[in-house]
Amino acid sequence: MTSKLDQLRAMTTVVADTGDIEAVARLKPVDCTTNPTIVLKALGTPMFADAIKEAVAWGKKQGGTPDAVAAAVADRLAISVGAALSGLVPGRVSTEVDADLSFDTEASLAKARAIIAAYKERGIERDRILIKLASTWEGIRAAEVLQKEGIDCNLTLLFSKAQAVACADAKVFLISPFVGRILDWYKKSTGKDYTPEEDPGVLSVREIYNYYKANDIKTIVMGASFRSAAEVEALAGCDRLTISPNLLDELAKDEGKLERKLSPENKTSVAKIIVDEKTYRWQMNEDAMATEKLAEGIRAFAKDLGTLRAMVSKELQLAAA
């Protein structure tokens, strides 16, 4: 009997949600996703000690305020992590635009273009990279422009159908609807436990997947943020799933039968809707879970980005001493 992970690979593109180089080499995913939390964790390992030294040495030669230099070095380190991952996977690596730019379309565009240019300097072309943007209205507008420039985007922190429809209207390459964080909110809100078939996060991704397939929307659906292997199994057949190494290992050790849950052939008819800015903002306002989790996610990523920049500032000060 083949493992559930191998069975999953036969119906879904498996992506690793990690910056752990050893885990990626061992698990052999098609793509990798990163975020500020993952980058910070990766840089804490011995594998990136030389990259930190190189980036700090580079930073010492740059002009600008100490904060600006620290931010530039932090960006360089995020690219270092992404470049290392890119050498291990045949597909794409997702690199995130600064969370503190989530409500600034023009600044997000500038940062996204800078990320693509930084990868190109290392010989990595744009077709190997996905630019991650928060699924705010401003982030979606930035993605719409980038897509027209040939820069593919991954819209993250997505918790609602309104966000998913707005992303589809913008013709983004890929969305990352979150599963586990939705479950977290409902468990805290209701005090209930949920089976995988009742899991609000699972049901949200299934609804979005069906809407996309029913309306022939080409945007890829990549379920993200899993709390258990059971959640992953409940979305078997989704276009892509980005999964942490510990859950990938769990699936690799399980030789039970994996049932396909999602398939384009099983779509049910649903009317196409248009989500303009006022509709997006109203529907988000009416969805307490989506509003709270989007804001919480942006704050968490911004905090980790701040931690990374503080670490860089300390290294720069030590190097200058």
Swiss-Prot record:
InterPro entries in the record: Aldolase_TIM, TAL/FSA, Transaldolase_1, Transaldolase_AS
EC number: 2.2.1.2
PROSITE patterns in alphabetical order: TRANSALDOLASE_1, TRANSALDOLASE_2
Keywords associated with the record: Cytoplasm, Pentose shunt, Schiff base, Transferase
Xref: HAMAP family: Transaldolase_1
Function: Transaldolase is important for the balance of metabolites in the pentose-phosphate pathway.
Subunit structure: Homodimer.
Name this protein carries in UniProt: Transaldolase
Organism field: Rhizobium rhizogenes (strain K84 / ATCC BAA-868) (Agrobacterium radiobacter)
Taxonomic path: Bacteria, Pseudomonadati, Pseudomonadota, Alphaproteobacteria, Hyphomicrobiales
Gene of this entry: tal
